[in-house]
Regions:
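Short, Lys/Arg-enriched N-terminal segment that forms or immediately precedes the first helix
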Residues: 16-19, 125-133, 175-182
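DNA-binding recognition helix and immediately preceding turn/loop
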Residues: 137-185, 206-215
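Compact structured core domains
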Residues: 60-62, 66-149
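N-terminal regulatory/effector-sensing and dimerization cores
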Residues: 2-94
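Short hydrophobic/aromatic patch on the recognition helix
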Residues: 174, 178, 222-223, 227
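Terminal helix-turn-helix DNA-binding modules in bacterial transcription factors
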Residues: 180-218, 240-249
């Protein structure tokens, strides 16, 4: 069991998990993630037998990997693909590959690092060359994200056809636009969005069954399958140790 209070902070376009977690299985998700070892080095596996032990790493959306904290306290910063930081990282991922080890700039004491993490201050945490100017998100994709992130407010519009008609595009054109703007498929992002919404439900109720319903999953078994596919871990191993869930406006 974790030795410290694990915490989860969720914002509209970013999330932070801090604490001790088990090693994951192979998985990929529809958002880039910054991994940081707060108390020591972790192991990261990807590709055809590639492995690094490091104190920090960036993993692009859609890249299959295995993360082993090796018992250390870690921080995981998930950036929605439309966030300014995620968009500014797309260029360096395209040039250097989907996994970038040892990306953190020297910050100093662990307390300072955790302060920057809680503020989601990536420019203070990462080497400057990693973050580059990116064009604004297409407003049609931005409108579809508003619907995807609030499924209870738009029943029946979460299917590809409904989202496409909402921005006056054909389904195939919308699919192409979404992937071009977000870097991930609509299908992958829809699952990711549901899992995030389910985790936000933990701020209201600690029961995983209630979280599954909050995420618009058919049942807790469906939620569990999608969670394992997304994070490579069971929901209970990650969410039950949480002592604090904070939702940001």
């Amino acid at each position: 069991m974790p030795q410290r209070a694990n915490t989860l902070t969720l914002g509209t376009d970013r999330a932070l998990y801090v604490g001790e977690i088990p090693a994951t299985g192979w998985h990929c998700h529809a958002s880039p993630v910054l991994l940081m070892g707060l108390s020591g080095r972790f192991a990261l596996h990807w590709g055809a037998g590639r492995m690094e032990t490091c104190r920090s790493a960036l993993v692009a959306a859609g890249v299959e990997h295995l993360f082993d904290p090796r018992g250390e306290v870690v921080a995981l910063v998930y950036l929605e693909p439309d966030s300014p930081e995620a968009r500014s990282l797309r260029g360096v991922f395209q040039r250097q590959g989907g996994v970038l080890p040892d990306v953190a700039a020297p910050v100093g004491a662990r307390a300072a690092i955790e302060g920057h993490l809680r503020a989601f201050d990536l420019p203070a945490l990462l080497h400057r060359y990693l973050l580059q100017a990116a064009p604004p998100l297409d407003p049609r994709v931005a409108r579809s994200l508003h619907v995807l992130r609030r499924p209870q407010q738009a029943p029946g519009r979460l299917a590809r056809a409904g989202l496409a008609s909402g921005v006056q595009l054909s389904a195939s054109r919308f699919n192409h636009l979404f992937r071009a703007e977000m870097g991930v498929s609509l299908r992958s992002y829809r699952v990711w969005s549901q899992v995030r919404l389910a985790m936000a439900g933990l701020a209201v109720s600690p029961r995983l069954t209630d979280a599954a319903l909050h995420g618009d999953f058919a049942d807790s078994a469906h939620f569990s399958r999608m969670f394992r596919q997304t994070f490579g871990m069971t929901p209970s191993s990650v969410l039950k140790p949480l002592k604090q869930v904070t939702l940001l406006d």
